């Protein structure tokens, strides 16, 4: 059979193969050279394996076994392999090993995209999406259970080693596979034990009754709430996307269930892996807080986000107060530094609470005895308030960066900039899940989950790049 006739001249698999040939694969060849001379199978060409995975993800294939099967009959895979089979173990190992090589690969592609003016870093979006880990909620155990499992696993390792030293009852390959499986389980249990200890120390200061639990299958996975309202072991994948053509510039799997602390980390990764910081970054309200605003200002990055007040009128209404008795409705005298309640009483300054990130909370309270005899007490006091209760309000003194941020976000120009967020950021998430089927990781562990997400985003970038070269609308071409 003539292999060249398997695919048309303009087939995307040819473009992927041509691109892989332009990349510097030194990192992968160095890894191969490091194990040359050792027993084992001949190593498959990294260019072929890279091309296979990029082509597979572009077609929604994330299983190494399925990709190995496709190499037997799918024309694009057959063309790449030259009608030769590729082991699913080779494919699986290549995907989750050599993170330095994959990072270098991603950086080279970003360099090519930047050289063509497709990535400018003038404006990027940051958004996170929850992707299910390769673990079940039933695998989460406490310290006592993990300790018992770990003890049994270590004993099994000892017995297998003794058996190997004496006389193997099983065939050599089966015996080696059995020992390897037991060692891997022991390693996961040791990681689960470390994670349980870390969580217990981290949370016991806030909750004395907290009982730490970790997965014995993927210890780094945390239970998170997903978009369907359920809770499953997951990773929170943070994606930074350039808004000019919707190309991904950075991706990272994290163990934080919320995005609150992720903006600073994303900026650090951009500077480290891309070599420069974006001029502007756009993120939703989950990222918008004093720490993020301060971090962006310190990095010299213009931040656009949706500020969510931590003290809302609805929270006051839940206490049974009418609108006139909400603290934000109290007039404030900046010169004399006091608030006036609906009864006309002055709430004087009583204390200053120093918060993190330069935030100071000023506390104002009514004089003693005033609230107990006030005719408006029933409208002002929460249900069940004690007789000595006094009304208090707070005033937040924000850092200059936060004040400037809030003023900027009130402008029409800033709102138009922020409106780009959902169109750019959420499309990437949809492509990862719907086109690639990445609703659950195949690999275990945060680092390997990051690598799997990187392969997906690399394939996504190439799909859009090829579409732009053909003059197609990038969004339409990717669907």
Show the residue positions of the predicted features.
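Long, acidic, intrinsically disordered low-complexity segments
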Residues: 1-9, 417
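A general alpha-helix detector
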Residues: 2, 48-54, 90, 108
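Basic, short loop/linker segments at the boundary and entry of helix-turn-helix/winged-helix-like folds
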Residues: 7-54, 59
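Helical catalytic core of nucleic-acid polymerases
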Residues: 24-28, 34-41, 46, 70-83, ...
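Anion-binding and metal-coordination hotspots
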Residues: 60-73, 84-479
């Amino acid at each position: 059979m003539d292999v060249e006739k398997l695919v048309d001249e303009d087939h995307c698999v040819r473009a992927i193969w041509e691109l892989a040939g332009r990349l510097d694969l030194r990192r992968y060849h160095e890894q191969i050279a490091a194990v040359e001379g050792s027993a084992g199978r001949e190593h498959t060409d990294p260019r072929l394996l890279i091309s296979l995975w990029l082509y597979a993800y572009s077609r929604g294939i994330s299983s190494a076994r399925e990709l190995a099967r496709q190499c037997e009959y799918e024309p694009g895979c057959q063309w790449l392999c030259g009608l030769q089979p590729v082991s699913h173990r080779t494919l699986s190992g290549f995907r989750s090993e050599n993170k330095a090589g994959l990072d270098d690969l991603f950086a080279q592609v970003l360099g090519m995209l930047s050289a063509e003016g497709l990535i400018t870093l003038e404006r990027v979006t940051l958004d996170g999406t929850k992707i299910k880990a390769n673990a079940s909620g039933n695998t989460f155990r406490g310290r006592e259970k993990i300790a018992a499992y770990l003890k049994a696993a270590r004993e099994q390792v000892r017995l297998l080693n003794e058996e190997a030293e004496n006389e193997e009852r099983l065939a050599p390959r089966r015996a080696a596979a059995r020992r390897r499986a037991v060692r891997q389980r022991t390693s996961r249990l040791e990681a689960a034990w470390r994670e349980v200890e870390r969580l217990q120390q981290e949370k016991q200061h806030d909750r004395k009754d907290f009982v730490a639990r970790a997965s014995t299958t993927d210890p780094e996975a945390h239970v998170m709430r997903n978009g369907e309202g359920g809770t499953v072991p997951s990773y929170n994948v943070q994606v930074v996307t350039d808004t000019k053509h919707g190309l991904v510039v950075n991706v990272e799997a994290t163990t934080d269930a919320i995005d609150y602390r992720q903006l600073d980390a994303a900026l650090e990764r951009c500077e480290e892996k891309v070599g420069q910081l974006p001029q502007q970054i756009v993120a939703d309200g989950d990222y918008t807080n004093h720490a993020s605003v301060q971090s962006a200002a310190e990095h010299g990055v213009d931040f656009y986000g949706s500020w969510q007040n931590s003290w809302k009128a609805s929270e006051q209404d839940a206490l049974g107060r009418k609108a006139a008795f909400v603290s934000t409705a109290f007039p404030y005298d900046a010169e004399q530094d006091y608030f006036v309640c609906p009864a006309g009483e002055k709430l004087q300054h009583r204390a200053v609470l120093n918060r993190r990130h330069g935030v100071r909370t000023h506390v104002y309270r009514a004089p003693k005895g005033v609230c107990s005899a006030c005719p408006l007490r029933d409208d002002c006091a929460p249900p069940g308030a004690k007789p000595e209760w006094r009304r208090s309000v707070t005033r937040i003194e924000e850092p200059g960066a936060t004040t400037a941020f809030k003023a900027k976000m009130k402008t029409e120009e800033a709102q138009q900039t922020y409106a780009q967020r959902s169109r750019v950021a959420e499309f990437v998430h949809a492509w990862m899940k719907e086109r690639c089927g990445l609703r659950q990781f195949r690999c275990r562990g945060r680092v390997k989950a990051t690598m799997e997400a990187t392969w997906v985003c690399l394939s996504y970038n190439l799909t859009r790049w090829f579409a732009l070269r053909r003059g197609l609308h990038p969004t339409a071409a990717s669907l």
